[in-house]
Curated annotation (Swiss-Prot):
Residues 169-409 form the Radical SAM core domain. It comes from Methanocaldococcus jannaschii (strain ATCC 43067 / DSM 2661 / JAL-1 / JCM 10045 / NBRC 100440) (Methanococcus jannaschii). Disulfide bonds: none annotated. This is Uncharacterized methyltransferase MJ1487. Belongs to the methyltransferase superfamily. Its EC number is 2.1.1.-.
């Protein structure tokens, strides 16, 4: 390609893995071999004048979560003001969880185009169309405004992870390896199945092996994974455990790393569901992984609330998971979400009892406040509020770090998100 187009990605800690996947998709197409790509941090993004002078067209790509909506609104306005004299050269492109769930609202923030859902196919096609002076508005998987009319070019089929690298090796950018995409569960508070679909897709062990080797050659020997449920790896339906596949994965990686590298499996960002924690899965962690704890999603201590959320597991599953993990000597962090829709005082009391029981068993509680998210069944639900009874019940555990999290900040953000989703106003 001729070097008349440049790409700038807003490469922040929260979104580097997303951009790693997209730049990786560009790298495997020789058409983009000469594409100038700028990885801009929070300072660099305001120092692009030399780039804008040099190229005819510049795509500025920004990914963000709903929790970052207000900061992103400020950012796009600041960029537009600073680079106003270059406006005819710039295309502001948004992608990620919030733009996918709220594309029209994202365009109204000031973006020119939104990439909806998975971008491994859409992103390269879009950049190529821009560079070739073709009508990029015909690219499938995007949305834009035409005289204030919302236009969506249509959803793409789910991508095959094995066709794309998890990160851009040629650009020397590395990170977590995405091993599974999609989620068969339909938790009403979660965007994952709405963004990536309910059909589970796994990266093959051989493909993962290849990229672990590449990292190891560069002395990058802490291996972490991106997956909605670590113990779901290799499962055809995402629900039935495939112990052999999980073992093959971990064993293969351990062979590459030997004793000089570390494998983190079942901790952030690859937590596990409680019903999948059993003697076999825990044994795999003990034999092959380096993490000394598991992060387990409980979300509530009330059967009723779990059913309202469509979680697909029981309170007893949570007890059993903690029991098995602790017996094996693993630490446990259990996620709870407070203020979920339909939660009553009785449900709060039940959750407090469960948390106290789990703490006695040796678990820690990772506390969250329910935040409504676009595209989810709970999008228009009232924002979560942490019942004072919970804080009182946990008052001795908070200073010890046994009950931890940013629930207070989330409570404030949840109010703002709820107002926005109900009114469309920031």
């Amino acid at each position: 390609m001729e070097e008349n187009t440049a790409l700038v990605v807003y490469y922040t800690k929260l979104h580097k893995n997303s951009f790693n996947a997209l730049i990786g998709a560009l790298e495997i197409d020789e058409y983009f071999d000469n594409l100038p790509i700028y990885f801009a941090n929070k300072k660099d993004i305001f120092n692009l004048k030399e780039v804008l002078k040099k190229y005819d067209k510049v795509v500025i790509a920004i990914s963000f979560f709903t929790t970052e909506l207000w900061k992103t609104y400020e950012l796009i306005n600041e960029l537009k003001a600073k680079y106003q004299s270059y406006r005819n050269k710039i295309i502001y492109l948004a992608g990620g969880p919030h733009p996918t769930g709220d594309p029209k609202g994202t365009l109204k923030l000031g973006f020119d185009v939104v990439c909806i859902g998975e971008g491994e196919e859409t992103f390269p096609e879009f950049i190529k169309a821009v560079n070739e002076d073709e009508d990029y508005k015909k690219v499938k998987g995007i949305a834009y405004l035409n005289d204030n009319e919302f236009i969506y070019t249509g959803r793409r089929k789910p991508v095959d992870l094995n066709k794309y690298p998890p990160f851009p090796v040629k650009h020397n950018k590395f990170g977590h390896i995405e091993i599974t995409r999609g989620c068969p569960y339909k938790c009403y508070f979660c965007q994952t199945p709405r963004i990536f679909g309910k059909k589970i897709r796994h990266r093959d062990v051989e493909n993962i092996y290849k990229y672990v080797e590449i990292m190891a050659e560069r002395n990058l020997k802490d291996i972490r994974f991106i997956t909605p449920n670590a113990f779901g790896y290799g499962s055809k339906d995402g629900k039935t455990l495939n112990i052999d596949k999980i073992e093959k994965l971990l064993e293969s990686i351990r062979e590459i790393l030997g004793n000089n590298g570390r494998i983190f499996f079942g901790t952030f960002p690859s937590e596990v569901r409680p019903e999948h924690v059993n003697i076999e899965t825990v044994d795999l962690i003990l034999r092959y992984a380096d993490n000394k704890n598991l992060v387990i999603g409980a979300q509530s201590g009330s059967e009723k609330v779990l059913e309202l959320c469509h979680r697909g597991h029981t309170v007893e599953d949570v007890y059993n998971a903690v029991r098995v993990a602790r017996k094996a000597g693993l630490g446990v962090d259990v996620d709870f979400i407070f203020g979920l829709p339909g939660e009553t005082e009785e449900d709060v009391e039940k959750t407090i009892k469960v948390m106290k029981d789990l703490i006695k068993m040796g678990a820690k509680i990772h506390a969250h406040t329910f935040m409504p998210l676009p595209q989810t069944p709970f999008a228009k639900a009232n924002p979560g509020k942490v019942d004072k009874k919970i804080i009182r019940a946990m008052r001795y555990e908070i200073p010890k770090g046994i009950f931890h999290g940013t629930w207070h900040n989330q409570e404030i953000i949840a109010q703002k998100i709820s107002k926005y989703l109900k009114t469309g106003k920031l």
